[in-house]
Amino acid sequence: MEEEKYLPELMAEKDSLDPSFVHAMRLLDEEIVKFQDSEGNKEDGEKKYLDIISNKNIKLSERVLIPVKQYPKFNFVGKLLGPRGNSLKRLQEETGAKMSILGKGSMRDKIKEEELRKSDEAKHAHLSDELHVLLEVFAPPGEAYSRMSHALEEIKKFLVPDYNDEIRQEQLRELSYLNGSDDSERGKGTRGRGIRVPSTPSRNRGGVISPAFPGRGASATRGAPITRGTISTVARGIPTPRAKAAPTTPGYRLPPPLTIETYDDYGYDDGFGEDYDEQSYDIYENNYNSQTQSVSEYYDYEHGTNEESYNHYEQEEWSKSRSTLKAPLQRPARAGYREHPYGRY
């Protein structure tokens, strides 16, 4: 009997036997394993030495059995392939090894698989074998064995019959994403309606701005010590405006009382359009004209000022203030004193 045809005949007899023939099935399995071991020993005998100096590429191949007999209801092929075969592709890229699912049950179409098994073509001879994963590596010796070891460790994780492990959950998420039903990546933001909340409390629309420091026209507290040579930021001589009921900001009115609107009554067209359309441009012009007059008075530094209202710093005051010292300092006489602090300008 030719050795090339012996193994396929053993596999064919095993498939043709009824599972009730337990002893015949056991004997056939032992014969198949014995023949495969003898073939492996022949190959090992021919390959006696490994040349690592030349660093030539070698080919390694291993067949990993898929435990379909122990777990017949679990879909190992589907777990290995993943959605659209992406899991097996990523596994090959990660390990650097070529992986192929071969053997009985590796094809989805069972009728076509049976037809190809009965054919005598050598490329379909694997359909008579047990369901397994063929690992092939073609690389230099050191790298080849390293890739094979990595591939064996990774393929072992896919042969665990667990429906809720990390690999299975990742495949389900990928499948939902590919089908377009993954809503986790789409953010659905809700927008509050009915109440308008100002973003910053510094200035409200139509409201009054609370001044943090004295503005124009504010009166300064008299009697406070004044540093010589510095210009005060408070305007002098301009009367303080009286308090008014309406805000002083031109073009704005007090907002209506805040009301909470329902979702049905609120619309995107509602806003401040009806309140501010009634104002005309004449109101803005009158406000700006009145403002220009007050500005001109503000920059007129001599308007409403009297020389008598300010203290004159002369030599007598300096001599009186230094009377308590034992030896007053002698200050050189100055050429003259300015009558008004803004005289030079």
UniProtKB/Swiss-Prot annotation:
SMART domains: KH
Molecular-function GO term, any one: RNA binding
Protein name: KH domain-containing, RNA-binding, signal transduction-associated protein 2
InterPro entries assigned to the protein according to its UniProt record, in alphabetical order: BBP-like (IPR045071), KH_1_KHDC4/BBP-like (IPR055256), KH_dom (IPR004087), KH_dom_type_1_sf (IPR036612), Qua1_dom (IPR032571), Sam68-YY (IPR032335)
Gene Ontology cellular component annotations, sorted alphabetically: nucleus
BP terms from Gene Ontology: mRNA processing
Bias (Basic and acidic residues) ranges: 336-345
Primary site of residence: nucleus
Record organism: Xenopus tropicalis
Database matches in Gene3D superfamilies: K Homology domain, type 1
Pfam families the UniProt entry points to: KH-I_KHDC4-BBP, Qua1, Sam68-YY
Gene field: khdrbs2
Residue ranges of the region described as Disordered: 178-224, 321-345
Domain KH: start-end pairs: 65-131
PANTHER family, per the entry: KH DOMAIN-CONTAINING, RNA-BINDING, SIGNAL TRANSDUCTION-ASSOCIATED PROTEIN 2, RNA-BINDING PROTEIN RELATED
Keyword check for DNA repair: no
